[in-house]
């Protein structure tokens, strides 16, 4: 870990818990002012803040035990000048529970300070204040206060949710103080545990840390995160679709999707488009593309892995099991496909006034374990039609698939030559599509690429370009000013507020939620809550959208550029250079988008 870098996942980790048994205060490590440039004001945790908290409780702290392996996080003098004794008790971490020697030393220290009357609080922290901290506090409760290990673990979890979240630590506590067979499973991890996902988890001395639930790598655990209560499709109940919340099935599905995509990161592995701007539009003349309408749907990958083993994976990496949905093998309709990974989106069609859920397949990565994602896009589209859609239709003809019993229908999404773009937006097509569409998707012919793909372009009318922010409503004021609520908008990978939004009565309910906003009349405007996402857009994504808003590719510019590409492809003499800036210039850009400075 870089010496001046904040610890991974520290930023939104809760500063402290509640007092445990009236004796211990668990907290994360404080960070001194030297880290302020990396930490927004509302996320800071200076030593002075601990002192102010104790004063608000009207309690004293006699001892602070620091379990980290470094002295770089804060100045111990800031603790000791408040009359608090500071003691460093280094515990390794990295998948190693506190040793018996660590435990005995901790208990002796605390017992000595606990003899004071009236008893004063003892503060305990490791990096995040959960595993090493919880382990030693629980050990003290058992050995010196005659608690059962079950009560100790449960009480700590209540005071510092979600409690000890490393499975190895829980098992070791129960091995020492109870029955290891009765050790509870690791709890569901909170969202802050999955931040800084591109970073290896290092402890304070630069060694690699372990994953929360076992001694395997933390990155593997991150792929198996669980968001309880995930909603499959907003606004409609889809029968036969249930969230997968148990291991090992959850992790197996997530890991298989990662492997099939060749994705070495964490989280959702699907290809992610970028916003079209005046620079990347030139890709349309540099390589072959197909175009389709951009549906206002919900992104899902689908893993088909045998009979009654069909799973949907959303952008939060939540997994849903789909029952009564069959995908027969074309060469033998009695067999079911397996090791097949599709990409697409769930949409809600309006048919005779009824809401009809459908899955539109627009790409395929694996077919019966074959890496069709490495083929060009035209071949992949043929594979979807021939190997996924047609066998289902054939089996329906025999009556062996009853569409009425399926939770939703499955269709291929059509792609066209880019010269059809105008008709998709302005012709009868837009009127005939029975679900919401909000732009165009330009798909290169090359192989499937997981993660952010700068070659896949999404075009939206400038009025519909949007950013997904995390909203944090904060009370702010200043000298001579009345305090007022301010909506701070945050993006991923940037600690400071990216922008602000006016707080309305409606907006208050979305505090700390992910919200989609558009830029209108020189300010950000709330559009909707993104219940399908737990994290905001990344900083680079947000900046790209802002660029599209302030310097947009209008519909007229897009059509003009495509027409020139078509003319050039036909060998006609170019009257104009292929540059979207030369004609049909957009109106003056709006005022500054409250971008970060």
Curated annotation (Swiss-Prot):
One of its GO terms (biological process) is 7-methylguanosine mRNA capping. CDD domains: Adenylation_mRNA_capping, Mce1_N. Residues 229-597 are annotated as: GTase. One of its GO terms (cellular component) is nucleus. Its main location: nucleus. Residues 330-386 are annotated as: Interaction with POLR2A. It comes from the Eukaryota. It catalyses: a 5'-end triphospho-ribonucleoside in mRNA + H2O = a 5'-end diphospho-ribonucleoside in mRNA + phosphate + H(+); a 5'-end diphospho-ribonucleoside in mRNA + GTP + H(+) = a 5'-end (5'-triphosphoguanosine)-ribonucleoside in mRNA + diphosphate. It is found in: Nucleus. GO terms for molecular function: ATP binding; GTP binding; inorganic triphosphate phosphatase activity; mRNA 5'-triphosphate monophosphatase activity; mRNA guanylyltransferase activity; phosphoprotein phosphatase activity; polynucleotide 5'-phosphatase activity. Changing residue 375 to R: Increases stimulation of GTase activity by POLR2A binding. Changing residue 294 to A: Loss of GTase activity. GTP binds at residues 299, 315, 343-345, 458-460, 528-533. The active site is at 126 (phosphocysteine intermediate), 294 (n6-gmp-lysine intermediate). Pfam families: DSPc (PF00782), mRNA_cap_C (PF03919), mRNA_cap_enzyme (PF01331). Interacts with SUPT5H and RNMT. Interacts with POLR2A (via C-terminus); this enhances guanylyltransferase activity. Binds (via GTase domain) to the elongating phosphorylated form of RNA polymerase II; can form direct interactions with the phosphorylated POLR2A C-terminal domain and indirect interactions via bound RNA. In the N-terminal section; belongs to the non-receptor class of the protein-tyrosine phosphatase family. This is mRNA-capping enzyme. It comes from Mus musculus (Mouse).
């Amino acid at each position: 870990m870089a010496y001046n870098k904040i610890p991974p996942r520290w930023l939104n980790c809760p500063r402290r818990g509640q007092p445990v048994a009236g004796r211990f205060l668990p907290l994360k490590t404080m960070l001194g002012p030297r880290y302020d440039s990396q930490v927004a004001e509302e996320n800071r945790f200076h030593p002075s803040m601990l002192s102010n908290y104790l004063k608000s409780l009207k309690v004293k702290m006699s001892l602070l035990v620091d379990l980290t392996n470094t002295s770089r996080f804060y100045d111990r003098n800031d603790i000791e000048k408040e009359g608090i004794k500071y003691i460093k008790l280094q515990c390794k971490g990295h998948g190693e529970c506190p040793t018996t020697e660590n435990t005995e030393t901790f208990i002796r220290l605390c017992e000595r300070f606990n003899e004071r009357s009236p008893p004063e609080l003892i503060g305990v922290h490791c990096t995040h204040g959960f595993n090493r901290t919880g382990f030693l506090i629980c050990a003290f409760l058992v050995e010196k206060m005659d608690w059962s290990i079950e009560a100790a673990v449960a009480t700590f979890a209540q005071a510092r949710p979600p409690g000890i979240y490393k499975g190895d630590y829980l098992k070791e506590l129960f091995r020492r103080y109870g029955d290891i067979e009765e050790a509870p499973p690791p709890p569901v991890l909170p969202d802050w545990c999955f931040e800084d996902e591109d970073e290896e988890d290092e402890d304070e001395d630069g060694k690699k840390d372990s994953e929360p639930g076992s001694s395997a790598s933390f990155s593997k655990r991150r792929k198996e995160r669980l968001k309880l209560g995930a909603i499959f499709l907003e606004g409609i109940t889809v029968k036969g679709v249930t969230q997968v919340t148990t291991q090992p099935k959850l992790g197996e599905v997530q890991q298989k999707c990662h492997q099939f995509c060749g994705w070495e990161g964490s989280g959702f592995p699907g290809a992610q488009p970028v916003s079209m701007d005046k620079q990347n539009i030139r890709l349309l003349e540099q390589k072959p593309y197909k175009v389709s309408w951009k549906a206002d749907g919900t992104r899902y990958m689908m893993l088909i892995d045998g009979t009654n083993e069909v799973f949907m994976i959303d952008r939060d990496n939540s997994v849903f099991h789909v029952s009564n949905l069959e995908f027969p093998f074309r060469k033998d309709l009695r067999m079911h496909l397996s090791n097949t990974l599709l990409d697409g989106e769930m949409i809600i069609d309006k048919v005779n006034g009824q809401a009809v859920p459908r899955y539109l397949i627009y790409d395929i990565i694996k077919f019966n374990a074959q890496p069709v994602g490495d083929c060009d896009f035209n071949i992949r589209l043929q594979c979807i039609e021939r190997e996924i859609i047609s066998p289902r239709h054939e089996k329906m003809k025999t009556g062996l698939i009853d569409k009425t019993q399926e939770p939703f229908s499955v269709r291929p999404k059509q792609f066209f030559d880019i010269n059809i773009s105008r008709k998709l937006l302005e012709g009868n097509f837009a009127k005939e599509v029975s679900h919401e569409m909000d732009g165009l998707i330009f798909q290169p012919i090359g192989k499937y690429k997981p993660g952010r793909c700068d070659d896949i372009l999404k075009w939206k009318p400038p009025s519909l370009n949007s950013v997904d922010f995390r909203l944090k409503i904060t009370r702010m004021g200043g000298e001579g000013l009345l305090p007022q609520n301010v909506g701070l908008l945050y993006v991923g990978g940037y600690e400071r507020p990216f922008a602000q939004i006016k707080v309305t009565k409606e907006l208050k309910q979305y505090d700390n939620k992910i919200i989609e906003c558009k830029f209108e009349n020189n300010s950000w405007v709330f559009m909707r809550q993104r219940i399908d996402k737990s994290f905001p857009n990344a900083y680079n994504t947000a900046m790209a959208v802002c660029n599209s808003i302030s310097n947009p590719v209008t519909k007229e510019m897009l059509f003009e550029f495509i027409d020139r590409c078509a003319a050039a492809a036909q060998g006609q003499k170019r009257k104009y250079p292929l540059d979207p800036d030369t004609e049909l210039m957009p109106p003056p850009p709006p005022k500054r988008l409250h971008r970060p400075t």
